[in-house]
């Protein structure tokens, strides 16, 4: 599975940003032909992206392109031209606003036909964005619809519009979505809730059930470092693999948060050692720092150590 701690969005109409993106520390770069590009600029942006894929040194980064959505007149031309005119440097196609498994299966068939027609050597992987009500209720079928599927993203902005949410920001919390503490004297604290928790958790569970990466939605206020870090830390703790980022100043933050800390790795290694010793003594559980460790602890600790080793290997390439 690819490392996907940070995934930097780069508008296809903004050629001046391509080189900067290639020099960033983002694990994955996605060049965008969809929401960040006006209708009048769609074809020009596609041409820009094709040239950038072929001409720019993207180093060892994973390179993706977000094409236009399934219900637009642009999507087939996007896919055809990308697979016909780009080198094998292209790794992934990102599909926005996916509503059901049938769409993914048709896209898989289309991509397969073009791969054969244009004699492409590398098999293209898929990233799916869930950002509609239909997409969320059908996410389990969508996740299984193609062997090309690698990651499921949550798109909070369009999802908010699809449910009629009274928000204008992309991702983050909303001060109006909260509850008052039960009345105790004259003091009643107000607690802001996470209005995206259900959608995030459903996507997270589905992604991991079918061996896909779970990627959190972008945080629109790129000037709010603390807000970004708070939500990223929350989704990392839940089990998300990474986060879509919309500004270069969010890349290092995401890479740091979605990587196990030295303390986490050291503790995980110690847990594995303790459990190995317990196994030698015929024990299935052991006390460690005042907590009970058992077989489940081995799985959790192994995940942390594997992720740390994978990041270390990537840095050595």
Predicted regions and their residues:
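Expand to "…catalyze enediolate/carbanion chemistry for C-C bond making/breaking, isomerization
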Residues: 1-317
